[in-house]
C-alpha cells in the first residue's frame, strides 16, 4: 500500500520536503529555545503573511517578497533584542500584530486573490512544487554546514553571550546572521507548513529532543530523528485519514511531547 502511495509524484515531493525540513528545522528550533527566542519563529511566520500579501497585491513573486519582508523583520528583531533586552516579548507582539494587520488589509484590497493568502496561512506539504523542494534542501545544506563549522561558537553565544564577546567572537554579527538564516528558513517553510503551524514544527521536535538527549549534540540528533519520524508519520496518516497534513503533523508532535513528558523521569533515571 505504501509502495503504491510512493508512486505518486506529489508524495515523493512531500517526502523529500519532510527530509529537508527535518534537517534544519529542529536545529534552528533548538537554538531559538536556548536563546529564549521561541516566539521569534511565531513572529516571523506571521510577518511572512505580510510578504505574501504584498506579493499578491503588487503582482510580484510571493516567494521573493516573503523572503525580503522576513529578512527585514529578522533584522528589526535583532535590533530590538539588543536595545530592549527586558522587553523582547513586547517587540515580538508588535511585529506579529503589524504583520497580520498589513496582510489582512492588502488581502482585502486584492479581492479575489485572498484565497492565495489562505493557502499560505494553512500550508500544504502535499502540493509543494519541485522548486520549493530544491529551495528547502538548499537551506537545509546551509544550516547543516554552518552548524558543523560553528557549533562551538554558537554554543558559547547561546549560553553566555558576554563570554563569547570577551573571547573575541563577533557576537552581533553572529546573532544577526542567525536571525537572517532563521527568517529565510521560515519563509521557505511557509508553503509546506503554513503560517499557523510552522512554529510548532520548528520548536516541538527540539523541545522533545531536550527531554531525551543528555548532551548538546545528542539533543540535535534526537530532535532531527523525531522531526523526521513525526513528519513522515503525519503525511501518511493525513493521506489515509484525509486530514490536513500540517495539522496532523502538529498533533503527532504534541502526542510525542506528552508521552516523553510522562516518561521523562524514567528516561532521566537511565
PLM features per residue range, with description:
Residues 2-7, 121-125, 226-263:
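C-terminal binding/interaction regions
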Residues 4, 8-13, 84, 92-153:
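Transmembrane helix-bundle core of multi-pass membrane transporters
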Residues 14, 62-68, 89-93, 137, ...:
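Loop-to-transmembrane alpha-helix initiation sites
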Residues 30-113, 209-221, 240-241, 264-266:
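Short loop segments and helix-boundary regions at transmembrane helix junctions
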Residues 47-57, 95-107, 127, 171-182, ...:
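Small-residue-rich segments of transmembrane alpha-helices in multi-pass membrane proteins
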Residues 145-178:
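Membrane-helix/interface signature in polytopic inner-membrane proteins
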Residues 152-153, 262-270:
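Membrane-interface capping segments at transmembrane-helix boundaries
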Residues 198-247:
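Transmembrane alpha-helical segments in multi-pass inner-membrane proteins
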Amino acid at each position: 500500500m505504501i509502495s503504491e502511495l510512493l508512486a505518486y509524484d506529489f508524495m515523493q515531493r512531500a517526502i523529500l520536503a519532510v527530509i529537508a525540513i527535518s534537517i534544519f528545522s529542529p536545529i534552528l528550533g533548538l537554538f531559538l529555545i536556548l536563546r529564549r527566542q521561541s516566539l521569534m519563529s511565531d513572529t516571523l511566520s506571521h510577518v511572512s503573511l505580510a510578504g505574501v500579501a504584498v506579493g499578491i497585491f503588487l503582482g510580484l513573486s510571493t516567494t521573493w517578497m516573503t523572503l525580503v519582508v522576513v529578512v527585514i523583520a529578522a533584522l528589526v528583531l535583532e535590533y530590538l533584542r539588543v536595545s530592549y533586552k527586558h522587553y523582547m516579548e513586547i517587540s515580538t507582539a508588535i511585529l506579529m500584530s503589524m504583520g497580520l494587520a498589513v496582510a489582512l488589509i492588502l488581502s482585502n484590497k486584492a479581492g479575489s486573490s485572498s484565497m492565495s493568502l489562505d493557502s499560505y496561512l494553512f500550508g500544504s506539504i502535499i502540493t509543494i512544487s519541485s522548486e520549493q523542494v530544491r529551495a528547502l534542501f538548499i537551506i537545509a545544506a546551509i544550516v547543516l554546514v554552518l552548524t558543523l563549522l560553528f557549533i562551538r561558537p554558537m554554543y558559547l553565544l547561546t549560553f553566555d553571550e558576554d563570554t563569547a564577546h570577551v573571547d573575541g567572537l563577533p557576537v552581533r554579527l553572529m546573532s544577526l546572521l542567525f536571525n537572517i538564516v532563521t527568517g529565510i528558513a521560515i519563509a521557505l517553510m511557509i508553503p509546506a507548513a503554513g503560517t499557523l503551524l510552522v512554529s510548532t514544527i520548528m520548536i516541538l521536535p527540539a523541545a522533545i529532543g531536550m527531554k531525551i538527549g543528555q548532551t548538546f549534540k545528542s539533543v540535535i540528533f534526537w530532535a532531527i530523528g523525531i522531526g523526521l519520524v513525526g513528519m513522515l508519520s503525519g503525511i501518511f496518516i493525513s493521506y489515509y485519514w484525509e486530514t490536513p497534513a500540517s495539522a496532523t503533523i502538529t498533533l503527532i508532535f504534541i502526542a510525542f511531547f506528552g508521552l516523553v513528558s510522562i516518561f521523562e523521569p524514567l528516561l532521566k533515571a537511565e
